[in-house]
Amino acid sequence: MKKKSSQFKINYQYREYHYKPEELELSSPDKPPVELAKIHNSENVLGLILTFYVSFAVPARKTAQILRDVFCIKVSHQTVLNYAAGAAWYCHRFNLKHKGLIDDISAGDETYIKILGKHHFVFFFISAKNLKITAYHLADNRGTQPAVIAMNEAIRTASDDQKITLVTDGNPSYPAGIHFINAQFDGATTIHHKKVIGLQNLDAESEEYRSFKQHIERLNRTYKYHVRPAAGFNCTNGAVSLTTLFVTHYNFLRPHMSLQHQPPIPMLELKNLPTIQARWTKILSLAA
């Protein structure tokens, strides 16, 4: 029996990524043209704006109306947006500095938003036990590069001897990105990856790690609730700014029932402050 010469050929694809450090930088808000210390309104007004616009997910125009009709404070909706953008620049540094250690298992996913009518994607990672957001990154695609950026930040504060497992869906960008990250460690550290596929547990791995995937899905729903009033964004910086402020609110201000009504990252400096606006202004003072 004559056999074809190609019968036993094995075909496979191999990809090797070569990213420069400047290509793996987190998305961050632009530095504001006006310092918050020089604004015409008081710190309390700034705190109220962030309380309504971010913590309570009130649109910018309605936030301005509440301040005018309830507190007799005259600000425009553009002032609300400008103050939020200015605060986000400080809060981004605050988020990174005070993230702290991470759990052994983190879950990640991406969700879409619209900027100028086009889809963009926000990558999130959340710690399994303390439920804090360990990474956030905005990109115009769901490829390997933004996945690497988000995962690099997610594991940045891990201890040297920690065994890290990242749980994601079936997006091939994540295993490709983990392959790149592990190659940078030269075998000194190995990041493990677990996939949760679909809505039903059709394999043992999906069944075992489904609960971790549900953490990130709930986070995505909470994020969508907070950005929905914006009805899309007119610029990338606006999207990055609101995402950054959402992370500050989620990690440091928002009480979680499963954490005994404490935020994921409790801070002594915020504990005894009675109002949300006071906590916002305290965060900004700590970040300055």
Model-predicted regions and their roles:
Residues K74, N82-L101:
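Short, basic alpha-helical nucleic acid-contact segments in DNA-binding proteins
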Residues A85-G86, Y136-D160:
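Active-site beta-loop-alpha junctions of metal-dependent nucleic acid enzymes
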Residues M1-V54, C72-S76, L101:
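Basic, short loop/linker segments at the boundary and entry of helix-turn-helix/winged-helix-like folds
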Residues L101-I115, F124-I126:
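Two-metal-ion RNase H-like nuclease active-site motif
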Residues A60-I73:
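DNA-recognition alpha helix
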Residues P229-A288:
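C-terminal domain-tail junction helix/linker
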Residues N171, P175-N234:
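Helix-centered, glycine/charged polyanion-binding patches within enzymatic domains
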